[in-house]
Amino acid sequence: MESQRNLLLIGLLFVSFLLWQQWESDKAPKPATEVTAAAQIHDQAINSDVPTADAGVPATVAATQNLILVTTDQLEIQINPVGGDIVHAALLTHKLEQNEEAPFVLLEQKNNFSYIAQSGLIGRDGIDSAASGRAKFAAAADAYTLADGQDTLEVPLTLTTDAGVTFTKVFVFKRGQFDVGVDYRVANNSAAPVQVQMYGQIKQTITASESSMMMPTYRGAAFSTADVRYEKYSFDDMGKKDLEEPTLGGWVAMLQHYFVSAWVPAAADKNTLFTSVSAGGLANIGFKGSVHDVAPGATETISATFYVGPKDQAALSALSDTLNLVVDYGFLWWLAVPIHWILMFFQSLVHNWGVAIILVTLTVRGLLYPLTKAQYVSMAKMRNLQPKLQDLKDRFGDDRQKMGQAMMELYKKEKVNPMGGCLPILLQMPIFIALYWVLLESVELRHAPFMLWIQDLSVQDPYYVLPLLMGASMWAMQKMQPMAPNMDPMQQKMLQWMPMIFTVFFLWFPAGLVLYWLVGNLVAITQQKIIYASLEKKGLK
């Protein structure tokens, strides 16, 4: 019994360690990045033809007066006709605060903060080179709206050069979607071939993530290549070394809690992914596509997709089979993915995320019931063996080797596995951690209500009722399990304090996770009563 108590304590503390370690290793906020001189020189070498990280950022509000406003059922976008950059993106179906009407704004420029998406054509005949400056497009209107019954909205920006080449930058919006098609149509009406190369980049002022120990979040960049499915590239990484990754297809992104912006170039195109950081603290991640030759009299379209919205796994997977990995479940992703699927399935049935979490808990506990029963049977047998084990200790005294051999023979004779009570606990720990990351990373749970005072399962209980109930249930479970009479007094005190320690620990956990743990405890108490009643009939106490 003593060994199982110790293992329970170790298992619970192990969870705490893993969560803390995960936060410390790659989630903790980092200070503002300092850019080394070597990195700046390398940046100039890689991206000498791409507009600098500071280019295209209006210094005053007056510079943004002629922005083009685009409104769909999902997005409110502002496009600067200089370069055709997306300088503002509000997500109309995601509120900034739960009980307010103001939408969540992902891309914006205000005060000393800038977060924009830029794209253009560079190369020999490009219109957006670092040397010549950004293209100045003309638009037929200053506002576009996706009308009722309309599924697609195109916003064309046009520029014709003195040589007779017409460049049309077309933004394509679709109903119900957060991805924006960006097409460059190059109509070469000149007498000479035109050579251009598309690029896209996301620029963001370096800021620390709004993170806490119980709610660790990542704010920074990420990318994917043909060889590397998903890799984070933090602001700190950018300051130390510029990225330069040639690949077929791929994507680049800027991540934050629940939301993402990403450039997804053509999958069949040869691209170079790159990063840079300006001396002013503006981080940049982007791609450069392959060179396109447009013959005289010909027209060619060069395309990429820009996503600006929530970390919706289905929507992201539709753009790239690896883009959904920005929903980062950590090292237990292989367990978190099916848990998320089960959670989504139950929610589709009951239309309440809290009830869905309860159903997931019942499912997990039901699947683990045979192991749970085996655990309590093993614990009961171990309790019955305590007098015989004490006799062995008295007989062999300090001869640990002989006493160990005698104990193993006794276990074999009585058909008792001393480790039999550990397996259910060890299995529940990964499930707990995986569910923690599901609740932390899944945007579906943002502002998701349960009932009564729990109106957002993704944040802590505002009145701490669930953590207190969880602590009480943990105390009740502990009282139901007989304490070994020969347990060390210090260990007894530690176990007695565990419910209170974990109550404090859970005060800042998301309410959804505390709900899972509370319901799990209540189910465990019920299972204990059933199993103990069965054991008493068999003469095991």
Curated annotation (Swiss-Prot):
UniProt function note: Required for the insertion and/or proper folding and/or complex formation of integral membrane proteins into the membrane. Involved in integration of membrane proteins that insert both dependently and independently of the Sec translocase complex, as well as at least some lipoproteins. Aids folding of multispanning membrane proteins.
Keyword hit for Transmembrane helix: yes
Subcellular location: Cell inner membrane
Name of the protein described by the UniProt record: Membrane protein insertase YidC
GO molecular function, one term: membrane insertase activity
BP GO terms, sorted: protein insertion into membrane; protein transport
Topological category with respect to the lipid bilayer: Multi-pass membrane protein
Complexes and interactors: Interacts with the Sec translocase complex via SecD. Specifically interacts with transmembrane segments of nascent integral membrane proteins during membrane integration.
Membership in a protein family: Belongs to the OXA1/ALB3/YidC family. Type 1 subfamily.
